[in-house]
């Protein structure tokens, strides 16, 4: 099973399918209200939240935030499994699919989901990501090692 939406969705009041939820709470409140249920979770997989936590990373949503994925999910919550993005075509993300996907992978997501069923978007995304660079090889190797 996949635990979602890490690092937490409780303080968000908007639906990320429709628009970007913005949370202005400080990290201490978020830790005890949203993040704590994910600490030492017994799951090999988690799905990220498309939420902007302004007091943690004012520039990037959790899915695309190196600060949140590395410092909170990996270090503070001690999650060592596979991190999967939520659907990269959701309205919470305002940029194009390629940009959103690359940013999520660069931030630390191991897999990026594209789930809206639009085959033209999927084709565009796959064509633009088809060049296997060193970064993609590293991510693929991490996934392979995890699944072994």
Write out the residue ranges for each language-model feature.
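Second-shell residues forming the walls of enzyme active-site clefts
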Residues: 2-136, 146
